[in-house]
Regions:
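Hydrophobic alpha-helical connector segments
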Residues: 55, 59, 69-95, 149-153
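Amphipathic, non-transmembrane alpha-helical scaffold segments
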Residues: 11, 57, 61, 82, ...
């Protein structure tokens, strides 16, 4: 097994343990046991539990940021951009439900990357809010409080990591379509 593959295996196993127990409760010994190796062997591939958490959270946050940039730069209507945001959340969450649990529940444990993470999150939310505000201005979206619209949508989208693993019979495309209908129909004019 290559160094990078083993590192990814460690990160994925840690994400699963963090989801099950929470970041603070997981030890390097727990991680080693889950992988069937000695704790000292982990340090051949990673430097600390904190580095694992950073790898999980920052990778996902950067993926969301890149997705949002693509959405912002598209020529789609504001309603279509909101649908693309729903699809972005579903695709990222479907591909990494364990990592999404860390993003939602353990971000505050980031140490030297906390400010960077918060910058990414704030930029994402600012862009999301901007789409909603432009949709209200262009009469695509009902004139409600844009922050309430955004946080209502984000609350649903951020909790998908809990629900998606239970619905293996539902494709990401079907879920994106259905969830867009539910979340956006109420604000669409």
């Amino acid at each position: 097994m290559t160094q990078e593959t083993r590192k990814n295996e460690i990160i994925n196993t840690a994400a699963k343990l963090f989801k099950e127990k929470g970041y603070s409760a997981v030890t390097m010994r727990d991680l080693a046991t889950a992988m069937g190796i000695k704790a000292a062997s982990l340090y051949n591939h990673i430097t600390s539990k904190q580095d694992i958490l950073k790898a999980i959270i920052i990778t996902i946050a950067e993926e969301f940021t890149a997705g949002m940039h693509a959405i912002m730069n598209s020529d789609a209507s504001n309603i279509e951009k909101l649908k693309k945001i729903v699809a972005l959340h579903i695709n990222i969450t479907s591909n990494n439900t364990n990592g999404m649990a860390s993003l939602n529940n353990d971000w505050m444990h980031l140490e030297d990357q906390l400010d960077y993470y918060l910058q990414l999150r704030n930029e994402y939310e600012t862009n999301f809010l901007s789409i909603i505000q432009r949709g209200i201005s262009s009469l695509e979206i009902k004139a409600n409080n844009p922050e309430i619209i955004m946080f209502s949508m984000l609350t649903t989208l951020r909790s998908l990591y809990l629900w998606i693993p239970k619905k293996e019979d539902l494709s990401a495309n079907d879920l994106a379509h259905s969830l867009s209908e539910v979340l956006i129909e109420g604000i669409n004019i």
